[in-house]
């Protein structure tokens, strides 16, 4: 708690049963899982969409794949009316093929190595940079506003140990905070 403070108590529903797998690839799959859970009276509180909710699997773009999610806002509303919260997976890495890669590089919102460059091919978001935090909050804010109940923040442990963060600290210090 000395580093990051005490967390607030999570909402009660977050302690319930989560239905997840790698991955539900469509609105139809998510709705089908929810329907079967309720039909079979299986207590559950969260439907989690892992890597496949993006247009390209594992390519975090903070948008539901339009060809597989006809109306994500309505899906979220409908799932909520059935007693489900919805969780979405994401990761803080952006490959050169990701649509946000050029913007993140241009704006300098990434962790650097000792030479001030990308530590490896992907951009890793630098959450010690207030501009990065604002960018990230805007992306997630759109999803929360739509009705998403939780975000699975994955792969923080992969941050480069030899990186230099905007706050001047090394990756060894910032690793997995």
Regions inferred by a protein language model and the residue ranges of each:
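Carbohydrate-recognition beta-sandwich/jelly-roll modules
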Residues: 1-45, 76-78, 85-86
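Aromatic- and carboxylate-enriched substrate-binding clefts and catalytic-loop regions
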Residues: 43-177
């Amino acid at each position: 708690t000395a580093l990051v403070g005490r967390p607030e108590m999570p909402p009660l529903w977050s302690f319930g049963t989560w239905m997840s797998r790698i991955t539900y690839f469509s609105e139809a799959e998510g709705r089908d899982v929810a329907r079967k859970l309720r039909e079979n009276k299986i207590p559950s509180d969260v439907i989690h969409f892992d890597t496949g909710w993006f247009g390209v699997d594992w390519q975090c773009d903070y948008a539901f794949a339009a060809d597989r999610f006809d109306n994500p806002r309505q899906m979220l509303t409908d799932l909520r009316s059935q007693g489900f919260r919805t969780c979405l997976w994401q990761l803080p890495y952006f490959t050169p093929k990701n649509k946000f890669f050029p913007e993140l590089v241009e704006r300098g919102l990434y962790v650097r190595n000792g030479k001030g460059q990308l530590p490896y091919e992907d951009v890793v978001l630098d959450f010690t940079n207030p501009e990065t935090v604002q960018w990230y909050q805007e992306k997630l804010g759109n999803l929360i506003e739509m009705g998403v109940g939780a975000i699975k923040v994955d792969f923080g442990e992969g941050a480069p140990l030899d990186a230099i963060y905007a706050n001047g600290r090394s990756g060894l210090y910032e690793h997995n905070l």
